[in-house]
Amino acid sequence: MENLNMDLLYMAAAVMMGLAAIGAAIGIGILGGKFLEGAARQPDLIPLLRTQFFIVMGLVDAIPMIAVGLGLYVMFAVA
C-alpha cells in the first residue's frame, strides 16, 4: 500500500508540472500572436508593446517554474 501511495505522489507531481508547462506554452503562444497583431496594426507602438510583451511573458513563464519547484518538493521532501 505504501508503494502505491508513492507512485500516486509521483504521478501527481508529474501531472502538476506537465499541465503547468502546457498551460504556459498555450499562454505564451496566444500572447505572441496578440503581440504580432498589435505590432502589425500600429507599428509605431512596437517598443511599448515589446516591453509589455516581455514583462507578461516572464510572468506567464514563472508559473511552470513554480510548479516544477512544488513538484520537486512533493517528490523529494514530502515522500
Swiss-Prot record:
Transmembrane stretches, by residue range?
11-31, 53-73
Under which name does UniProt file this protein?
ATP synthase subunit c
Task: Sum up the protein's function in the record's words.
Answer: F(1)F(0) ATP synthase produces ATP from ADP in the presence of a proton or sodium gradient. F-type ATPases consist of two structural domains, F(1) containing the extramembraneous catalytic core and F(0) containing the membrane proton channel, linked together by a central stalk and a peripheral stalk. During catalysis, ATP synthesis in the catalytic domain of F(1) is coupled via a rotary mechanism of the central stalk subunits to proton translocation. Key component of the F(0) channel; it plays a direct role in translocation across the membrane. A homomeric c-ring of 10 subunits forms the central stalk rotor element with the F(1) delta and epsilon subunits.
Cross-referenced NCBIfam families, in alphabetical order?
ATP_synt_c (TIGR01260), PRK06876.1 (NF005363)
Q: Which Pfam families match?
A: ATP-synt_C (PF00137)
Q: How does it assemble?
A: F-type ATPases have 2 components, F(1) - the catalytic core - and F(0) - the membrane proton channel. F(1) has five subunits: alpha(3), beta(3), gamma(1), delta(1), epsilon(1). F(0) has three main subunits: a(1), b(2) and c(10). The alpha and beta chains form an alternating ring which encloses part of the gamma chain. F(1) is attached to F(0) by a central stalk formed by the gamma and epsilon chains, while a peripheral stalk is formed by the delta and b chains.
Family the entry assigns: Belongs to the ATPase C chain family.
Residues the record marks as site: Reversibly protonated during proton transport: 61
Its GO CC terms are: plasma membrane; proton-transporting ATP synthase complex; proton-transporting two-sector ATPase complex, proton-transporting domain
Output one GO BP term.
proton motive force-driven ATP synthesis
Q: Is S-adenosyl-L-methionine among this UniProt entry's keywords? A: no
Q: Which residues carry this modification: N-formylmethionine?
A: 1
Positions in the Periplasmic compartment = 1-10, 74-79
Q: Report how it sits in the membrane.
A: Multi-pass membrane protein
* InterPro entries recorded: ATP_synth_csu_bac/chlpt, ATP_synth_F0_csu, ATP_synth_F0_csu_DDCD_BS, ATP_synth_F0_csu_sf, ATPase_proteolipid_c-like_dom, F/V-ATP_Csub_sf
The note filed under miscellaneous reads: Dicyclohexylcarbodiimide (DCDD) binding to the reversibly protonated aspartate residue inhibits ATPase in vitro. In this organism c-rings of between c(8) and c(12) can be isolated in vivo following experimental manipulations, however only c(8) and c(9), in addition to c(10), are partially functional.
**The keyword Mitochondrion is assigned to this record:** no
Q: Which GO terms describe its molecular function?
A: lipid binding; proton-transporting ATP synthase activity, rotational mechanism; proton-transporting ATPase activity, rotational mechanism
The organism of origin for this protein: Escherichia coli (strain K12)
Primary localisation category: membrane
What spans does the record annotate as topological domain Cytoplasmic, numbered to this chain? 32-52
The alphabetized UniProt keywords are: ATP synthesis, Cell inner membrane, Cell membrane, CF(0), Formylation, Hydrogen ion transport, Ion transport, Lipid-binding, Membrane, Transmembrane, Transmembrane helix, Transport
Localization terms from the record: Cell inner membrane
CDD domains assigned to the protein according to its UniProt record, in alphabetical order: ATP-synt_Fo_c_ATPE
